[in-house]
């Protein structure tokens, strides 16, 4: 533990008179953050967790732990028999076979449906065998641009939800794991998709409110809103506490597009995404406290992140959200996402603030891909599926695998412990009551990251990696044969039309020459 005590006190403790008051005062001193110098004196050196002056949360999309690290040495990966063959499988209702996890070298994957009801079905009361059943459902996706097999899954081939990748496919991600910290029991905050994960990342709750701007009418909700138009979030998010405590922050967003749905689709048509657009990956513009605090300008384009990292002007807290192209959200390419993440991390490592930075890299949900570890049940919302996650920092232990049960809530908890003296997003203490059923950061199942750091070690040097490393990934995708055929047919039609037009033009010119009278 960090030695940081949350400021929330029980009613019993407050009845113990003078002794309790004294204890509370001592506790308050213990959570007051880094020591400050007397006027005219040099500032004392930061110690422990407070050596981290910059927290960066990089959130990628839709991959399970077993899909990316199921064969990583020493991790709780895909169970295997003595001969090395996977000993687990998922029933395929179409072929009636039980499909084992297999090495998938395709750069483009399709994944499976990944909303709340699909999480329940995939988990299947802890049996973890519903992945192919969900991927095979005729309504498992909505027919939109970008999903060649949508609504008409070919019974001759299996969806790729049982596929996994190894270190030859994603070498940079495995390099970060082997040089820093890999967390092999990190669970998404809720058994749902992207919307709830991003909501919990900034506010530790996802809810829908029957009356706009009235937090008392809000109730926990896992499905994403059917429409993002006119949505408002009146409960407290983490930026409110940071604003009140003068802790700098920015939410960096990549301009482009994001999927316009998540619950019933493997992939969806894109919707525009930018600094001012509301979306499942950019939730803060919806929060009323962000508007009231005048902090909408802190939601910025990712280009500002690169500039700040190079100049040494990063805020205390940075969230970095991708666009569709670089997100790794199927059907986007894995290699493109890896290049994007590597560029973010390289830029920080080359900058002047690397020695005081902690980067938390994670994927927001499982994307319908297989994972063999059943998540713990902590409240009505979660936890959700296991996802890849890493800690990258000069104070991160080298090559350490953290087997502790964790959830993505732990990032908020770390920020609160480092910069807010342990204060939680708690209606009892933050001055903005809301009816959230639990204060997530106080749940013991959330865990903490104290095992992942060694603040007594000499700061680790940067690990600058190639942006486009050699990989064994191939550019064709599982189930993409139909796409290839369609492309070929379209190409033939286009070429044929061009040739026909040329032939017609030639004949017309010849006819015109014949009809011209001679003089």
Where are these regions (language model features)?
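Short, Lys/Arg-rich cytosolic juxtamembrane segment immediately N-terminal
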Residues: 13, 17, 478-483, 508-510
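Core hydrophobic alpha-helical transmembrane segments of single-pass membrane proteins
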Residues: 24, 489-501
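C-terminal membrane-anchoring or membrane-association module
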Residues: 496-519
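Bacterial N-terminal signal peptides
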Residues: 20-30
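N-terminal pro-sequences and low-complexity stem/linker regions of secreted or lumenal proteins
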Residues: 37-480, 486, 490-494, 516-519
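Compositionally biased, low-complexity segments
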Residues: 6-7, 26, 94
């Amino acid at each position: 533990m960090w030695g940081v005590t949350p400021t929330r006190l029980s009613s019993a403790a407050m009845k113990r008179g003078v002794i309790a008051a004294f204890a509370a005062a001592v506790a308050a001193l213990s959570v007051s953050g880094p020591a400050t110098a007397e006027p005219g004196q040099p500032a004392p050196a930061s110690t422990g967790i407070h050596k981290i002056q910059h927290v960066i949360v990089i959130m990628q999309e839709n991959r399970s732990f077993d899909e990316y690290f199921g064969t990583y040495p020493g991790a709780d990966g895909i169970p295997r028999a003595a001969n090395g063959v996977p000993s687990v499988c998922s029933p395929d209702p179409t072929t009636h076979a039980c499909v084992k996890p297999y090495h998938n070298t395709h750069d483009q994957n399709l994944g499976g449906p990944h909303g709340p009801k699909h999480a329940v079905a995939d988990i299947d009361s802890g049996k973890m065998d519903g992945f192919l059943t969900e991927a095979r459902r005729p309504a498992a996706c909505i027919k939109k641009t970008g999903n060649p097999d949508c609504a008409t899954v070919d019974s001759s081939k299996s969806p790729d939800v049982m596929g996994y990748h190894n270190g030859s496919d994603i070498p940079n991600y495995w390099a970060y794991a082997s040089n820093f910290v890999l967390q092999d029991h990190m669970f998404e905050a809720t058994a749902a998709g992207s919307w709830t994960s991003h909501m919990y990342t900034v506010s530790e709750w996802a809810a829908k409110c029957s009356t706009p701007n009235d937090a008392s009418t809000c109730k926990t909700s896992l499905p994403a809103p059917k429409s993002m138009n006119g949505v408002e979030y009146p409960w407290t998010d983490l930026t409110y506490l940071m604003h009140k405590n003068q802790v700098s922050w920015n939410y960096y967003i990549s301009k482009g597009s994001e999927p316009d749905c998540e619950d019933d689709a493997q992939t969806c048509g894109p919707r525009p995404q930018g600094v001012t657009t509301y979306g499942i990956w950019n939730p803060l513009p919806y929060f009323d406290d962000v508007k009231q605090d005048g902090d909408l300008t802190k939601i910025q384009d990712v280009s500002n992140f690169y500039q700040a990292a190079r100049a040494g002007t990063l805020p205390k807290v940075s969230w970095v959200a991708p666009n569709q192209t670089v997100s790794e959200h199927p059907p986007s390419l894995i290699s493109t996402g890896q290049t994007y993440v590597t560029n973010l991390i390289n830029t920080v490592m080359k900058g002047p603030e690397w020695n005081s930075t902690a980067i938390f890299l994670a994927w927001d949900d499982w994307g319908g891909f297989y994972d063999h570890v059943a998540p713990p049940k902590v409240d009505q919302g979660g936890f959700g599926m296991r996802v890849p996650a890493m800690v990258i920092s000069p104070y991160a232990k080298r090559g350490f695998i953290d087997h502790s049960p964790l959830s993505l809530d732990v990032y908020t908890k770390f920020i609160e412990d480092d910069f807010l003296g342990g204060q939680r997003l708690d209606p009892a203490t933050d001055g903005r009551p809301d009816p959230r059923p639990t204060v997530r950061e106080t749940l013991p199942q959330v865990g903490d990251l104290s095992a992942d750091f060694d603040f007594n070690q000499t700061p680790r040097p940067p690990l600058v990696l190639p942006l486009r490393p050699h990989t064994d990934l191939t550019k064709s995708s599982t189930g993409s044969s139909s796409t290839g055929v369609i492309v070929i047919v379209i190409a033939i039609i286009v070429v044929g039309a061009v040739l026909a037009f040329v032939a017609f033009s030639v004949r017309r010119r010849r006819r015109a020459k014949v009809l011209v009278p001679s003089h």
